Curated annotation (Swiss-Prot):
One of its GO terms (molecular function) is proton-transporting ATP synthase activity, rotational mechanism. Key component of the proton channel; it plays a direct role in the translocation of protons across the membrane. Belongs to the ATPase A chain family. The keyword NAD does not apply. F-type ATPases have 2 components, CF(1) - the catalytic core - and CF(0) - the membrane proton channel. CF(1) has five subunits: alpha(3), beta(3), gamma(1), delta(1), epsilon(1). CF(0) has three main subunits: a(1), b(2) and c(9-12). The alpha and beta chains form an alternating ring which encloses part of the gamma chain. CF(1) is attached to CF(0) by a central stalk formed by the gamma and epsilon chains, while a peripheral stalk is formed by the delta and b chains. It comes from Coxiella burnetii (strain Dugway 5J108-111). Signal peptide: none annotated. HAMAP family: ATP_synth_a_bact (MF_01393). This is ATP synthase subunit a. The chain crosses the membrane at residues 39-59, 97-117, 139-159, 205-225, 239-259. Gene3D superfamilies: ATP synthase, F0 complex, subunit A (1.20.120.220). Pfam families: ATP-synt_A. Keywords: ATP synthesis, Cell inner membrane, Cell membrane, CF(0), Hydrogen ion transport, Ion transport, Membrane, Transmembrane, Transmembrane helix, Transport.
Length: 264
């Protein structure tokens, strides 16, 4: 990892923290404010999602009941771990929630893992193709983490209606936690409680990966003889961070859906 000699330290950091943007108003590669699509986030997340599906598909096609290979063993362990986690928290039909939990964990982990790729490698490759800015860690982009957390929020609402019905959910919102006499306060508390969930879910993942990426960029600015040692130390620690953050996102998703699915 090394910094470009033409850039100052501040410019180097700014360059690596900038996205490849598409303005959805006029479809030019400029900043369109709210109507901006971060192409780098889209490309990397879709490629990693496709890679995840392809690997699982190939291993499933070649699965054997006799002597499983290393890939089959690893995937079976991941599937059993995800199913066991869901079973401990969610007591309804797991046919949707268990695959969702597995998908979230693997996909988020793969996107987090991009933080361990040398900071100059992928941006340099795209720079050869004329792309000035390219940020290779999708989960360090709040637009992606908020998109995922909002999707979880929609699922929570879906399970609320599915398990309790419109009338049952309405009664719960109006009467809890303080009883019918304090309905306005109950509604306010419920709105705050439900609104905080997707925000905290998104910001927790984004904050940890953004900070991790920034530290790698700062390490790349150091003299070459210190980059390897500090880079290895931070990589080993960050490997734990990216795994834990993927697990937390998966676990909180399951917990939120489980709470929504509980009928009272």
């Amino acid at each position: 990892m090394y910094a470009q000699p033409k850039l100052t330290s501040a410019e180097y950091v700014q360059h690596h923290m900038s996205h490849w943007k598409l303005n959805l108003h006029n479809f030019t590669f400029t900043d369109g404010g709210f109507w901006t699509l971060n192409l780098d986030t889209l490309i990397i997340s879709v490629v990693l999602g496709a890679l995840f599906i392809l690997i699982f598909y190939i291993v499933a096609r070649r699965a054997t009941a006799s002597v499983p290979g290393k890939w089959q063993n690893a995937i079976e362990m991941a599937v059993e771990a995800a199913d066991g986690t869901v079973k401990d928290s969610f007591h309804g039909d797991r046919s949707l929630v268990a695959p969702l939990a597995l998908t979230i964990f693997i996909w988020v982990f793969l996107m987090n893992f991009m933080d361990l790729v040398p900071v100059d490698l992928i941006p340099r490759l795209f720079q050869m193709g004329g792309v000035e800015h390219f940020k290779a860690v999708p989960t360090a982009d709040p637009t992606l983490t908020f998109a995922m957390s909002i999707t979880v929020f929609v699922l929570v609402i879906f399970y609320n209606f599915k398990m309790k019905g419109a009338i049952g959910l309405g009664k719960e919102v109006l009467s809890r936690p303080f009883g019918w006499y304090l309905m306005p306060i109950n509604v306010i508390f419920r709105l705050i409680d439900e609104g905080v969930k997707p925000i905290s879910l998104a910001l927790r993942l984004f904050g940890n990966l953004f900070a991790g990426e920034l530290i790698f960029i700062l390490i790349a600015l150091l003299p070459w003889w210190s980059q390897f040692t500090l880079g290895m130390v931070w990589t080993l620690f960050h490997l734990l961070v990216i795994t834990v953050q993927a697990f937390i996102f998966m676990m909180l998703t399951v917990v939120y859906i489980s709470l929504a699915a509980e009928s009272h």
